[in-house]
Amino acid sequence: MNQSCPNKTSFKIAFIQARWHADIVDEARKSFVAELAAKTGGSVEVEIFDVPGAYEIPLHAKTLARTGRYAAIVGAAFVIDGGIYRHDFVATAVINGMMQVQLETEVPVLSVVLTPHHFHESKEHHDFFHAHFKVKGVEAAHAALQIVSERSRIAALV
């Protein structure tokens, strides 16, 4: 499926957020939306989609990419070691799935799916990752603007 990015200043980005550790993941979304608004004067529309966990992000991203409505898609989740399963397997599956979606649909899929080596339900860890997700949201906004711009530039060459 060949989908070109919009060749205009106004476009849409889908933001898919996992609801596990929502209080932390929400910080990425809030800073992402705020940074896009600050950088574009509100010309970029962000549509928010909730999924139960990180594992559901790739399928949701693929479904949204196929609509042709979005110049880019962002997935955000916090995959931690809960002591029951190997969280790194889940994170790898999610990231690989997101990569596959963008390669198949030609819609950029950006990741704010973070997997710490260790996370403990302590105030110190919570505060650290709360702040870290804010930073990652801003970084994702910059990356989204850059990749949409570059994709538009490439589309103009074809």
UniProtKB/Swiss-Prot annotation:
Pathways involved = Cofactor biosynthesis; riboflavin biosynthesis; riboflavin from 2-hydroxy-3-oxobutyl phosphate and 5-amino-6-(D-ribitylamino)uracil: step 1/2
Q: Which residues bind 5-amino-6-(D-ribitylamino)uracil?
A: 20, 54-56, 78-80, 111
Active site positions, chain numbering: 86
Q: Which UniProt keywords apply?
A: Cytoplasm, Riboflavin biosynthesis, Transferase, Virulence
Tell me the InterPro entries matching this sequence.
Answer: LS, LS/RS, LS/RS_sf
Biological process (GO) annotations held by this record are:
riboflavin biosynthetic process
Record's note on what induces expression: The two ribH genes may be differentially expressed during the Brucella infection cycle. Brucella would use RibH1 for flavin biosynthesis during the extracellular phase and RibH2 during intracellular growth.
Q: Name one GO cellular component term.
A: riboflavin synthase complex
Q: Where in the cell is it found?
A: Cytoplasm
GO function terms (MF aspect) = 6,7-dimethyl-8-ribityllumazine synthase activity
Q: What is its EC number?
A: 2.5.1.78
Record: residues binding (2S)-2-hydroxy-3-oxobutyl phosphate: 125
- Biotechnology comment: Could be useful as a specific antigen for the serological diagnosis of active infection of both human and bovine brucellosis. Has been used as a protein carrier of foreign peptides and proteins. The described characteristics of BLS make this protein an ideal antigen carrier for vaccine development.
Q: What if the gene is knocked out?
A: Cells lacking this gene are not auxotrophic for riboflavin and grow at wild-type rates in both rich and minimal media. But simultaneous disruption of ribH1 and ribH2 is lethal. The ribH2 mutant shows a decrease in survival and replication in macrophages at all time-points and is attenuated in mice.
Concerning Pfam families, the annotation shows: DMRL_synthase
Instruction: From the UniProt record, list the reaction(s) this protein catalyses.
Output: (2S)-2-hydroxy-3-oxobutyl phosphate + 5-amino-6-(D-ribitylamino)uracil = 6,7-dimethyl-8-(1-D-ribityl)lumazine + phosphate + 2 H2O + H(+)
Quaternary context: Homodecamer, arranged as a dimer of pentamers.
Q: Of which family is this protein a member? A: Belongs to the DMRL synthase family.
Question: What biological function has been recorded for the protein in this entry?
Answer: Catalyzes the formation of 6,7-dimethyl-8-ribityllumazine by condensation of 5-amino-6-(D-ribitylamino)uracil with 3,4-dihydroxy-2-butanone 4-phosphate. This is the penultimate step in the biosynthesis of riboflavin. The isozyme RibH2 but not RibH1 is essential for Brucella intracellular survival and replication inside macrophages or in mice. Displays low catalytic activity in comparison with the isozyme RibH1. Is a highly immunogenic protein.
Protein's name in the database: 6,7-dimethyl-8-ribityllumazine synthase 2
Q: State the organism named in the record.
A: Brucella abortus (strain 2308)
